Regions:
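Positively charged, small/polar-rich N-terminal and surface patches that mediate targeting and assembly
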Residues: 1-102
Length: 102
């Protein structure tokens, strides 16, 4: 079992929902997030995800527990989507292994 986390700007939320639907991910959770960076100067790898204290960056985080093959398929679809757009804020997706659960 894998824990998949996806960061998505709200402008691409509909596209993310379509990706979930296309590969039959029927159970996932989402939350709105405000990102902050102490010195948002535009020179770091993550500067497009975090705003300054005065202007936080608003995005969504979606997450789901998936079988490994489904998690890999989801990341492949996110990668395909990112390659199809010209944006400073592509979706970010992470797979985290689940060691134990009860």
């Amino acid at each position: 079992m894998k824990f998949v986390i996806i960061q998505c700007v709200k402008a691409y939320h509909h596209e993310l929902e379509q990706i979930f639907k296309s590969i039959r991910i029927n159970a996932y959770s989402e939350m709105d997030v405000e990102g902050f960076m102490e010195q948002a100067d535009g020179n770091t790898d993550f500067s497009n995800w975090f705003g300054s204290r005065k202007n936080p960056y608003n995005y969504m985080v979606s997450f789901s527990f998936l079988a490994e093959d489904k998690a890999n398929e989801l990341l492949e679809r996110v990668d395909e989507f990112n390659k199809s757009i010209e944006s400073m804020s592509p979706m970010k997706a992470y797979i985290v292994g689940v060691e134990k659960f009860v």
